[in-house]
């Protein structure tokens, strides 16, 4: 599964940028997101500040959320 953070401008709701998360992070993301079932590859989730903070650690980078709506998408490789 490929996971991507999509950042949308809060005013225009246009896609501002994307961040691909590291391969093999399924187990860590499941814990962060509270998933019980495996993902199908067509899901999208709005992210809370707590989830963003945990994903920043996982991705080893800062995600600027103050002026963006952040969503996590699950995509089949």
What are these regions (language model features)?
Residues 3-8:
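A short beta-strand micro-motif
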Residues 15-40:
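Short, flexible N-terminal segments of the mature chain
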Residues 31-77:
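Acidic, low-complexity intrinsically disordered segments
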């Amino acid at each position: 599964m490929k996971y991507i953070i999509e950042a949308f401008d809060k005013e225009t709701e246009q896609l501002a940028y994307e961040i691909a998360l590291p391969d093999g992070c399924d187990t860590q993301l499941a814990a962060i997101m509270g998933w019980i079932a495996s993902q199908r590859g067509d899901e999208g989730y709005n992210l809370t500040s707590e989830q963003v903070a945990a994903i920043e650690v996982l991705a080893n980078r800062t995600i600027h959320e103050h002026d963006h709506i952040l969503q996590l998408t699950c995509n089949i490789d």
